[in-house]
């Protein structure tokens, strides 16, 4: 059972009709856990997405995630030197909690293809924080493999 940090970008892809995004969320719901921050910034972002999209599949996914107790919580604060470094790279401040929980999580997996995750940012996250930023196709393949590494 892996711990996944899922950027809201993935939820918006589901709303756009991306079947890989939907398959990924369903695989995570069946076999894995989703990482949230104790401060609830990520949950608030998810709720904003659900409110904007009014997508019943996303709403049901989120309800089932809670019912299945498939959430795990970590601090959403990054050490300040990493926060400063990312902000210098023009990384969006609202995405910092996602990076922070990915950093603290067991598997250090973050799924996003958002433009904030430039090659430079992804390199920094991998080298300095051991956080691996995965594309949707990479994440789907890994999520469907239910064996832990």
Would you name each region that the model predicts?
Residues 11, 41-43, 116-118:
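Short, solvent-exposed loop/turn segments at secondary-structure junctions
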Residues 1-4:
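Extreme N-terminal starter segment of soluble prokaryotic enzymes
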Residues 37-38, 108-111, 115-149:
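Acidic, PIN/NYN-like endoribonuclease modules and their adjacent C-terminal/linker elements
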Residues 22-26, 62-63, 99:
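Short amphipathic alpha-helical segments and helix-helix/interface helices
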Residues 43-44, 48-70, 133-149:
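Extended, non-globular alpha-helical segments
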Residues 6, 18-53:
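PIN/NYN-family metal-dependent endoribonuclease catalytic core
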Residues 12-16:
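Short N-terminal binding/cap micro-motifs at the start of the first secondary-structure element
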Residues 71-110, 115-121:
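Active-site neighborhoods of divalent-metal-dependent phosphate/nucleic-acid chemistry enzymes
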């Amino acid at each position: 059972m892996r711990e996944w940090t899922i950027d809201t970008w993935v939820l918006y892809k589901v709303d756009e009709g991306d079947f890989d995004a939907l398959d990924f969320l369903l695989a995570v719901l069946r076999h894995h856990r989703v990482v949230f921050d104790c401060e609830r910034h990520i949950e608030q972002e998810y709720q904003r997405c659900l409110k904007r999209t009014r997508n019943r599949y996303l709403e049901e996914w989120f309800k089932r995630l809670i019912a299945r107790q498939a959430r795990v919580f970590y601090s959403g604060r990054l050490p300040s030197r990493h926060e400063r470094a990312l902000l210098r790279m023009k990384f969006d401040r609202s995405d910092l909690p996602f990076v922070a929980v990915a950093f603290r999580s067991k598997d250090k997996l973050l799924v996003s293809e958002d433009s904030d995750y430039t090659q430079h940012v992804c390199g920094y996250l991998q080298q300095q924080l051991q956080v691996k930023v995965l594309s949707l196709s990479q994440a789907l393949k890994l999520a469907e493999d239910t064996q832990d590494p």
